């Protein structure tokens, strides 16, 4: 089974590009399932129901989000109604929607968990405190994908090591990571650089 994970779809231009490229790419690469991050799909940022419909009509099967999703008040109304759009599980039980979902392909069920890192992102609980119970929720799924939306590479690597042998994939298909220096690429953000910055 071929599963495609797509990082942040940004704005109307990103949605339009997706619609023009994804159908042909799915056919060319024999993609069975597409999971995309839609937290910045609305103009500016956030996600709206119209942006979500644009993404789905392009050929995406499932949408994950991140911290920017909640910048649009509309999201609070449709997250509870959609099982194919999930929010980070560790943003609090009071938030609408769920932090996990299942894609039922008939013979194969794919469990998807959405988490949010804590470094440089406000408002999230420790993702390690909830991941075991979330993995239990999707234990009947043959394929288990964890999308950890995080800034620090160290958080993503730590989650990957923790879920080694438990999850099929731990991914972070996001483009907002800091990439200025090798230290920053490896999650060592708070170490001072020699040039004083």
Model-derived regions: residue spans:
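Acidic, metal/ion-coordinating pockets
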Residues: 1-197
